[in-house]
Amino acid sequence: SILQITISTNFAGHAGQDSALAPNGIGYGDLFLAPSWTPFGVDAHHQNDNAANGTRWTYGFNLDNRWSNTGGTFSLYALNGSNNSNNALLSENFLSCILDIQCFYRDGQVVSVNPTSSSVANTGVTGTWAVNPNSSIVFTLNTTGTALNNYSDLALHWSQTCGCDVIEGVGTLPEPATLALLGLGLFGLGVSRRQSK
């Protein structure tokens, strides 16, 4: 089954800005996934939700070059640690205000898979990501043979490396057989349209 996730953000196409605040500037964060969403807090925007108290993410799409404004590839990592801090790098690992320049970032936000952590495992599965400037970032992955293929719900988390604009939520996934039937139906519709012309 093909999983495609679109993150709508005006930041798309602007990686590398604010290079005075961090090496390479602000980049794109990795995409994190889990079978359920358990944000911290009851406020509408979950402003106090962070790596220590929110959803424990179970998979991460580790980007090949988070400062590319065209996209690239990513590696799927299984996040096996008991908490997010064991599995990920946080916003403060990428950005701080130590350069005697006033800056703003959201402390404690999961931003990147930590590929050097002993609690994460590269699954060997790769996907692609593309940037639509001023609009969106699109992640595409073939989930065949992964546990993601068995999820009925899919929670996600994405942010820039500064952690300022966190996008989180949950959606229901169709059954893999339903996706295959839908694809077959659309193919049949395309064939019937061609034949009728």
Describe each region flagged by the PLM.
Residues 196-197:
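C-terminal outer-membrane/trafficking sorting elements
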